[in-house]
């Protein structure tokens, strides 16, 4: 039998060759399958691609979510809907401009559906699901594509958006001016409850003559001119506001019987003011009530400001038709307090109280939280006015209050000088008389007859009159802004000796900032029967 020749090749090598061919075939099949899958993936509707989201996010979402965060989240349907809705709104305006009303109507309809879905999601506190978002996003995508296909290009969109933004800015500016005017009107108005209280107190004064004798005794008290006591002055026609100032001051004083309050009001409020302070206890402090009409020496022949207040042109400027640019841009120019002599009495303190040497001036919209008697021992270094400076903000520099384009101002004052605040000031009346500050005040009022140096208020002439005569105090003595600034640090308020509700949002008004109102209410005698009757009336 013939024998086959021996094959010296290894069997292992033949097996290796078979495996190589098997692996090559497997990779070829896998590549073909991957190609088919990728091809199918790219064939999908673009709107479906926009809707892809990780469903696991929905499964772990809490039942009540922060909808603001949901709208701003890059992975939420809410944000996608909001972005498409914004773009659709732009195309609504463009479609209307091109008289394509049908497309504008379709877009508006989808926008309303989108807004409804977003509001429902916000109300229920749960994210929008895929099934809810899909029909709206698909419809909006189709309409946006239709708008783009109508050749509403980017340039057209930008021009339309620009004009729309300008129109919105004009409306916003008009609304801001209107809000300022309305806020000013509310701030100027006397609340019904305060008017009611004034009437009741005036009636008491008229029907009870015994109070007149007590008032005369108070006015002749030797404590009123005793320089060993602590003297405070308040000029106001607001009974409740003045009461809170006095009550908060005596409540925080270590020795309230050593305090003397000098209150000046007008003829209208004089009787009510007397009746209130005679019928309430202020811990033994001395209180003097006077009327500004008593100061016969304060007349037009002596005081330029009195002459201006009586001037018909000045009254027309404040109360006439709003035809000037000043009254349009500055609605507070028309505030009647700028025509009230009470507002200007602070410049005549040494003449009103000729026997006093030092006094603390308090506005009627402040609340005292600490003992103020240490103010009287402060060293003012020969200055007249101790006040808290307000130049931490740039807009409280001199150039913001005064017209530095006028050489009379620019040649004498530093535009970057720090402003300061009225509201809580300690005055050295001896230094005042020596520097003749009131004469300075008269000079600047004369120079401002045409209102070319400043427009309104008592602070600008105060900055001029006390220039170089003001001693800066620690800011904790006087914290301002509670009548307009909602973001004052609580720690600053709590450590303040005096908090000041300067601004339109006074604490006795309904538009007061609620966060700050309790500080004022704490010192209001709300248990008084007249207050209870008038609040519920």
UniProtKB/Swiss-Prot annotation:
Name of the gene: GAUT11
InterPro entries, sorted: GAUT, Glyco_trans_8, Nucleotide-diphossugar_trans
Positions annotated as glycosylated: 66, 247, 299, 403, 436, 525
Phenotype on disruption: Strong reduction of seed mucilage accumulation, associated with reduced absolute levels of rhamnose (Rha), galacturonic acid (GalA) and xylose (Xyl) but increased absolute abundance of minor sugars (e.g. galactose (Gal), glucose (Glc) and mannose (Man)). The double mutant muci70-1 gaut11-3 is completely defective in seed mucilage production and exhibits a strong release of minor sugars in total mucilage extracts.
GO molecular function terms listed in the Swiss-Prot or TrEMBL record: glycosyltransferase activity; polygalacturonate 4-alpha-galacturonosyltransferase activity
Catalytic reaction annotation: [(1->4)-alpha-D-galacturonosyl](n) + UDP-alpha-D-galacturonate = [(1->4)-alpha-D-galacturonosyl](n+1) + UDP + H(+)
Cited Pfam families: Glyco_transf_8 (PF01501)
Keywords on record: Cell wall biogenesis/degradation, Glycoprotein, Glycosyltransferase, Golgi apparatus, Membrane, Signal-anchor, Transferase, Transmembrane, Transmembrane helix
Subcellular location: Golgi apparatus membrane
GO BP term, pick one: mucilage extrusion from seed coat
Family in the record: Belongs to the glycosyltransferase 8 family.
Primary localization: Golgi
Coiled coil location: none
Membrane topology type: Single-pass type II membrane protein
A cellular component term, taken from the record's GO annotations: Golgi apparatus
Regions of this protein lying in the Cytoplasmic compartment: 1-16
Quaternary structure annotation from Swiss-Prot or TrEMBL: Monomer.
EC nos: 2.4.1.43
Protein's job: Glycosyltransferase involved in pectin and/or xylans biosynthesis in cell walls. Required for the biosynthesis of pectin in seed coat epidermal (SCE) cells. Collaboratively with MUCI70, essential for the accumulation of seed mucilage, a gelatinous wall rich in unbranched rhamnogalacturonan I (RG I), and for shaping the surface morphology of seeds. Catalyzes homogalacturonan (HG) elongation by acting as an HG alpha-1,4 galacturonic acid transferase.
Annotated pathway: Glycan metabolism; pectin biosynthesis
Protein name as catalogued: Hexosyltransferase GAUT11
């Amino acid at each position: 039998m013939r024998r086959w020749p021996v094959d010296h090749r290894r069997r292992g090598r033949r097996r290796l060759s078979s495996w190589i061919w098997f692996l090559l075939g497997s990779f070829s099949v896998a590549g073909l399958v991957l190609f088919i899958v990728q091809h199918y993936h790219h064939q999908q509707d673009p709107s479906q691609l926009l809707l892809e989201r990780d469903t696991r996010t929905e499964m772990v979402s809490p039942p009540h979510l922060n909808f603001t965060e949901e709208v701003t989240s890059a992975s939420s349907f809410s944000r996608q809907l909001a972005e498409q809705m914004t773009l659709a709104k732009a195309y609504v305006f463009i479609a209307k401009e091109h008289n394509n009303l049908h497309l504008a109507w379709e877009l508006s309809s989808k926008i309303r559906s989108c807004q409804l879905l977003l509001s429902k999601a916000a109300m229920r506190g749960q994210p929008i699901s895929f099934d809810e978002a899909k029909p709206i996003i698909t419809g909006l995508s189709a309409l946006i594509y239709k708008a783009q296909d109508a050749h509403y290009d980017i340039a057209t969109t930008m021009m339309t958006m620009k004009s729309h933004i300008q129109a919105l800015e004009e409306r916003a500016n008009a609304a801001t001016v209107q809000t300022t005017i309305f806020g000013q009107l509310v701030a100027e108005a006397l609340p019904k409850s305060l008017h009611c209280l004034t009437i009741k107190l005036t009636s008491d004064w008229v029907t009870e003559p015994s109070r007149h004798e007590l008032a005369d005794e108070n006015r002749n008290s030797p404590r009123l001119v005793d320089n060993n006591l602590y003297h405070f002055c308040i000029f106001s026609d607001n009974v409740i506001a003045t009461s809170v100032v006095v009550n908060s001051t005596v409540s925080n004083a270590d020795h309230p019987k050593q305090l003397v309050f000098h209150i000046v009001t007008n003829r209208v409020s004089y009787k009510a003011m007397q009746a209130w302070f005679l019928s309430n206890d202020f811990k033994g402090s001395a209180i003097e009530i006077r009327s500004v009409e008593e100061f016969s020496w304060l007349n037009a022949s002596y005081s330029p400001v009195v002459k201006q207040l009586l001037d018909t042109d000045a009254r027309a400027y404040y109360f006439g038709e709003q035809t000037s640019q000043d009254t349009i841009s500055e609605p507070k120019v028309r505030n009647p307090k700028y025509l009230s002599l009470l507002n200007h009495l602070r410049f005549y303190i040494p003449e009103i109280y000729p026997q006093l040497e030092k006094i603390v001036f308090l506005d009627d919209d402040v609340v005292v939280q600490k003992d103020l008697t240490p103010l009287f021992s402060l060293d003012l270094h020969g200055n007249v006015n101790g006040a808290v400076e307000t130049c931490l903000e740039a807009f409280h520099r001199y150039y913001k209050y005064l017209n530095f384009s006028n050489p009379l101002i620019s040649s004498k004052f530093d535009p970057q000088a720090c402003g300061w605040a009225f509201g809580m000031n300690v005055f050295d009346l001896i230094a005042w008389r020596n520097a003749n500050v009131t004469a300075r005040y008269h000079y600047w009022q004369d120079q401002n007859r045409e209102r070319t140096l400043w427009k309104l208020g008592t602070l600008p002439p105060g900055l001029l009159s006390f220039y170089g005569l003001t001693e800066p105090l620690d800011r904790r003595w006087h914290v301002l802004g509670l009548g307009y600034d909602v973001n004052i640090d609580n720690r600053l308020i709590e450590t303040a000796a005096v908090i000041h509700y300067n601004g339109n949002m006074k604490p006795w008004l309904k538009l007061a900032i609620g966060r700050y109102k309790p500080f004022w209410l704490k010192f209001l005698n709300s248990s008084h029967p007249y207050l209870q009757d008038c609040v519920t009336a």
